[in-house]
UniProtKB/Swiss-Prot annotation:
Keywords: ATP-binding, Cytoplasm, DNA damage, DNA recombination, DNA repair, DNA-binding, Hydrolase, Nucleotide-binding
Organism: Caldanaerobacter subterraneus subsp. tengcongensis (strain DSM 15242 / JCM 11007 / NBRC 100824 / MB4) (Thermoanaerobacter tengcongensis)
Binding site for ATP: L20, R21, G62, K65, T66, T67, E128, D129, F130, R171, Y181, R218
Binding site for Mg(2+): T66
Amino-acid positions noted as binding DNA in the UniProt annotation, renumbered to this chain: R310, R315
Taxonomic lineage of the native organism: Bacteria, Bacillati, Bacillota, Clostridia, Thermoanaerobacterales
Domain notes: Has 3 domains, the large (RuvB-L) and small ATPase (RuvB-S) domains and the C-terminal head (RuvB-H) domain. The head domain binds DNA, while the ATPase domains jointly bind ATP, ADP or are empty depending on the state of the subunit in the translocation cycle. During a single DNA translocation step the structure of each domain remains the same, but their relative positions change.
Catalyses which reaction(s): ATP + H2O = ADP + phosphate + H(+)
Keyword Nucleotide-binding attributed: yes
Subcellular location: Cytoplasm
Region (Head domain (RuvB-H)): 255-338
This protein's encoding gene: ruvB
Protein name, entry field: Holliday junction branch migration complex subunit RuvB
Amino acid sequence: MEERILTQNFTQEDATEYSLRPRWLSEYIGQEKIKQELKIYIEAAKKRGEPLDHVLLYGPPGLGKTTLATVISNEMGVGIKITSGPAIERSGDLAAILTNLQENDILFIDEIHRLNRSVEEILYPAMEDFELDIVIGKGPSARSIRLSLPKFTLIGATTRAALMTSPLRSRFGVINRLDYYSVEELKEIIKRSANILNIGIDEDAAFEIARRSRGTPRIANRLLKRVRDFAEVKGNGYIDYNTANIALNMLGVDEMGLEEIDRKILIAIIEKFGGGPVGIDAIAASVGEDGDTIEDMYEPYLMQIGFLNRTPRGRVVTKLAYQYLKYPYVEQRRIEDV
């Protein structure tokens, strides 16, 4: 049971992704405030010989929550078990994981907001008292027994912290929000990844890829690898500014980092719904995309760059987006856009 929940097939692509991940806080680029706090918490926990307090990491996808969890395990010198909320279907699944942890180990649960409520309730005594309540038998003869667990650290990650229940969220002693990365930080990440992958790249090319990476390291590394493919097939393998610019344009990634689906979302709201306000379900139906995907993957960045507002009545495209997409903007439409 535990094997199914904790492991996946390890592909060559996974190996490449893993090689790009920093292993220590000193190698981790960006999120400076979080790193400084974690250094203190980790050093204090190690001095006391205790596990690190439970940690909740939240923010848009691709910002390094899983990577940061593995960095914490390395800094603490302990093992880490990685799973996800949807993978833990029954309380028995979680019990199997918890009882197989070693002292001071880290349990990382991605998408923790998607935990089954009955599973979540098993976590409460485990997080607070390092004890596990299990029920043996059924019906009138059923009885509950309490097992002692090794002390451990739970690191939860979520893109939608608002969907977590208050009892679960309140049990985390350390709560950090990961923010989008600056272009300069992404440029350093791209240069580091290029060095690991033996890719030749100049400063201007690294900056151009970073500029179009939506503030997200995962996207920056993905674009770097696709530009590398272009450079190897259409050029001499070296990535200069011209090569990067042509490749990114071919990929449909514009100067703001917008891709086809971003433009479809904005244009659909403008052309079909008068610029908004409009609900997420209507947007999803009009562009043929899942509503949760739009909320998790596309909407946060569009809001971050000021192209989309979320109001009580729905989503509204801003004047800035109208100007960028070269659509005429009618002022009286945008009473909500202030």
